[in-house]
UniProtKB/Swiss-Prot annotation:
<keyword id="KW-0963">Cytoplasm</keyword>
<dbReference type="InterPro" id="IPR013785">
    <property type="entry name" value="Aldolase_TIM"/>
</dbReference>
<comment type="function">
    <text>IGPS catalyzes the conversion of PRFAR and glutamine to IGP, AICAR and glutamate. The HisF subunit catalyzes the cyclization activity that produces IGP and AICAR from PRFAR using the ammonia provided by the HisH subunit.</text>
</comment>
<comment type="pathway">
    <text>Amino-acid biosynthesis; L-histidine biosynthesis; L-histidine from 5-phospho-alpha-D-ribose 1-diphosphate: step 5/9.</text>
</comment>
<dbReference type="GO" id="GO:0000107">
    <property type="term" value="F:imidazoleglycerol-phosphate synthase activity"/>
</dbReference>
<dbReference type="GO" id="GO:0016829">
    <property type="term" value="F:lyase activity"/>
</dbReference>
<keyword id="KW-0028">Amino-acid biosynthesis</keyword>
<dbReference type="InterPro" id="IPR050064">
    <property type="entry name" value="IGPS_HisA/HisF"/>
</dbReference>
<comment type="subunit">
    <text>Heterodimer of HisH and HisF.</text>
</comment>
<comment type="similarity">
    <text>Belongs to the HisA/HisF family.</text>
</comment>
<protein>
    <recommendedName>
        <fullName>Imidazole glycerol phosphate synthase subunit HisF</fullName>
        <ecNumber>4.3.2.10</ecNumber>
    </recommendedName>
</protein>
<dbReference type="InterPro" id="IPR004651">
    <property type="entry name" value="HisF"/>
</dbReference>
<dbReference type="GO" id="GO:0000105">
    <property type="term" value="P:L-histidine biosynthetic process"/>
</dbReference>
<keyword id="KW-0456">Lyase</keyword>
<keyword id="KW-0368">Histidine biosynthesis</keyword>
<feature type="active site">
    <location>
        <position position="11"/>
    </location>
</feature>
<dbReference type="InterPro" id="IPR011060">
    <property type="entry name" value="RibuloseP-bd_barrel"/>
</dbReference>
Amino acid sequence: MVALRLIPCLDVANGRVVKGVNFVNLRDSGDPVELACKYSEAGADELVFLDIRASVENRKTLVDLVSRTAKSVKIPFTVGGGINSINSINDLLRAGADKVSLNSSAVKNPDIISKSSTNFGTQCIVIAIDARKKITKYNEWEVYVKGGRENTGLDVISWAKKVEELGAGEILLTSMDGDGTQNGYDLLLTQTVANAVNIPVIASGGAGSVEDIYDVFTKGKASAALLASLLHDKKLTIDEIKSFLIEKKLPIRPN
């Protein structure tokens, strides 16, 4: 059985790790390189580094920061934010990233998914989907871009199927309603997307306890759990989470 993964997420703005609630009210959580080293040494299975301002301000992700961070860790590392060309992907992979995460650019130009997966391999291409519940529907969600500021009107499930067809290797699925709340993952959203595709789904948005993480693996059918506030706020450690999940007989890589 493939091991389930715990993935700390480093949201970066202006060179600092930040975290908010529902994509707003951002607060400083530390230096990205220091936190990357800390989580790598603590037993994280992978890391995700997202320049959350890049898409909004049309800037390239800071390649030098990526390079310094990637050189500091020995685990797989995904980079996202403002990536809108094959050249940008190439620059980031050369800077040390193992994978790139595409969001706004993939919605605007879906061909970038197929072209990048052909050029670099599907294993390098992660499609980030920021999902928000439709007010009038219990089990329907819409895709948002530009850091959660713009509603595309796209149905999340249809888009997830489309990106898989185009060559995405993974989906990074964020519940905007749960982001930063520590009230638990959106299990219905995660399970619905996981059941609709045959590629790994990384669940994001809402982790507040070890039980939440257990639930997103067992009920949500996620292949990986993204962790941010829970770790940045020192509510739990990676070791504590892994110990709990191993006791529950889940396939987790021990520290």
